[in-house]
Amino acid sequence: MNRTFVLCKPDAVERGLAGRIVTRFEDKGLKIAAAELRVADSDTLDQHYAEHVEKGFYPDLKAFMSRGPVLAMVLEGPEDTFAMVRSMMGETNPATSPPGTIRGDFGTEMTENLVHGSDSNESAEREIGIWFPSL
């Protein structure tokens, strides 16, 4: 089994879409290995977005990501789990995401794009270590 990290962002939780997003992953055969609904603290966000901390947009991103609960998850599946999740999510910009993807079906804007998924196996392990240090 391969695993990846997925985060339903505050907009997904606020809009009542987290369950529908999880169902899409489960319907593709992915299994939830860990999940936690929580408000992300400053340290966790700084670690998760370490490459963005010094960028001009980071304060707005951090404010958005900490404004309400997120659903952090570890999903397990086949060797290409992270790629499967990324394909299901769609493009970063919901406006360019095809129908049938999470962002294409439910997304409204670039920043508030519902979901984050690790972009590689290495990123998945790093992000799992940040959000679920006991795994």
Q: Which functions belong to the PLM regions below?
A:
Residues M1-L135:
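Non-catalytic terminal and connector segments of soluble metabolic enzymes
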